[in-house]
Amino acid sequence: MKTSLRLTSLALFMAAAMTASAQEGKPWIHDPSTIMQCDGKYYTFGTGGGGLISADGWNWYPGAERPGGGAAPDAMKIGGRYLVAYSSTGGGLGGGHAGRILTMWNRTLDPKSPDFGFTEPVEVASSEVDEDCDAIDAGLFMDPTTGRLWCTYGTYFGFIRIVELDPQTGARVEGNEAVNIAIDCEATTVIWRNGWYYLLGTHGTCCDGVNSTYNIVVGRSRNVTGPYLDNMGRDMIAGGGKMVVDAADRQFGAGHFGRYVEDEGVEKMSFHWEADLDRGGRSVLAIRPLLWENEWPVAGESFTSGVYEISSVRRGYALELAVDFVRHDIPRSRWWEASDEPIASYPNQTLEEVKDTWPEGEIPARIGDWMNRPHQRWTITAVPEAGGYLGGQYYKIQIEGTDRVLAAAKDAEVTVAPSFTGAAEQLWRIEQLTDGTFRIMPKEVPGTDRQYVLTSIADSTPTLAEYDFNSDNCKWKFIRK
């Protein structure tokens, strides 16, 4: 019996860990490209050719097609076409550093489309056998301030370099000279935000499974060609770099950063784990929230099931079941009198003490002072069969110890239903925003096809409304209990 209990506990632990850390399906990939969306599906390419496709952003399966083989591709949509860059040889393969960076175009990423077909690849950079740079690990960047297209490449065997490409052809700009911008990293890419260019690179040892020390670091510059300095003022050309994400509890070797901007204040970062212990030590696709702290990118945490206080950022009040307040029958301290009586420890109010005072059927939701009472404690549980969205799955939000669940209702209202049916209005998308707070979005709202989020329309009144990152009404915090 003890052995059985131990095995059951281990299975539950591993299931929770998998839920927290990995995409579902068969997300096996190494060196994933930046995630692209095409005709309602998500795509990423990896080393060796091919890649993954997802219909919802959570369940990933093989199926993406990319000719040319090679290593560490990247992808970008420019106008109505997709530009894919990849490297041929390089990386110290065969004992040398000879390599080539190539680019090619496609009108679609869907291999089943009649429009699918890559153009002939064009060489945009190369390296010689004994050169101090490897032409490998391409990263594409379109400067939103100038419309100029750039490509970084290189590994920790030498310099990271940046070259300019023609956004119309994908070819190297004539006469452009490569600029050295970093050392001691690989799998680089540039992103832009609020006047800063950020160079993200993968530092550490690669390709050794659970023993890989891969981690993702960053520096920033006011110019696309550098210098890129970290938070301590160290230049990445001298080995600097501020940590963005490193190993997790059961996942190791974070590498090959990609950024996906879904909405204002909603950003995701993609990368691979070199080894996921809960997935047989395989290299897997990972997607995390991308946060920004003091103008530096930081990896957020994937949301996990548990018991939570759901606190409105608007005022700090807690989401609750709208029932009558039941006084906790604990003697009041006579603080004005001295006493030598022993100090007692009293329990919190329990569900059994109050549940019979609650009405049957549907009950409205409300926001009120946090008192750690049963009508304020929410058990949040993943619903795997409901699918997901980019980087996350849907959850049910229920009053702890009961069947009562939070639900979207007609006229963009929010209520608490008596039981969970699996209906779309009872499924919730919980996404961490770039400032660390969360938005809570029902999968569907009865009577409309518009997307709404849980909103504090007043200090004590929750409703559903359009998302506005600049309003604290739309933001929530989850405090684990």
Predicted stretch roles:
Residues S33, D74, E123, T189, ...:
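Residue-level detector of beta-strand face positions
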Residues A11-S21:
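Hydrophobic h-region of N-terminal signal peptides that target proteins for export
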Residues M1-S9:
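Bacterial N-terminal signal peptides that target proteins for export
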